[in-house]
């Protein structure tokens, strides 16, 4: 019994000792404070930005278009009476003088046989025919007399075939055309061309169609012909007053 008490007392002391150790350990655990970590502020981040591009220069202001210069309307020229046609008469070329043949040389005289008598040998007769005199040039006076009587005939004849273009009449176009044409001895128009335009293509075409339709003019006098033809330059008037 005593031994049992002694063991019980020993076990009780050991239990008390173990409990005391655990109590001390619990107290130390509770009083132990873990140092809190100090949070440092985040480091400042330096970001280097590229410089902004320079703004593009503004485009130059567009120049305002200049208004077109006002077109001055020129008044229509006053039509004057058509001048009389000029007829070109070429002067006939002067005939060239034929070269004269060389004069025959005289043969030397034979030696004299006797002093009292002399023998003279005549030169042989020349076989060259006598030179013909140049033909007289045609008289200019006769041409000038025949010119006034014929110069208006081609113009009057061609005027019968003249047509005023309808589009030119509507647009009020007027003008004077100068027509150059060559006529043979029979009055046939050999060639023609404009010597001076009126400034209107329609009137120019009408003049060329006029002489193309006519084809012929009155026969010219023979004394006006040069190598069988005569050249005429004549004006043709297109006027709204005359139609």
Swiss-Prot record:
Residues 149-243 form the TonB C-terminal domain. It is a single-pass membrane protein. Keywords: Cell inner membrane, Cell membrane, Membrane, Protein transport, Signal-anchor, Transmembrane, Transmembrane helix, Transport. The chain crosses the membrane at residues 13-32. The keyword Transferase does not apply. Residues 54-151 are annotated as: Disordered. Belongs to the TonB family. This is Protein TonB. It comes from Pseudomonas putida (Arthrobacter siderocapsulatus). The gene is tonB.
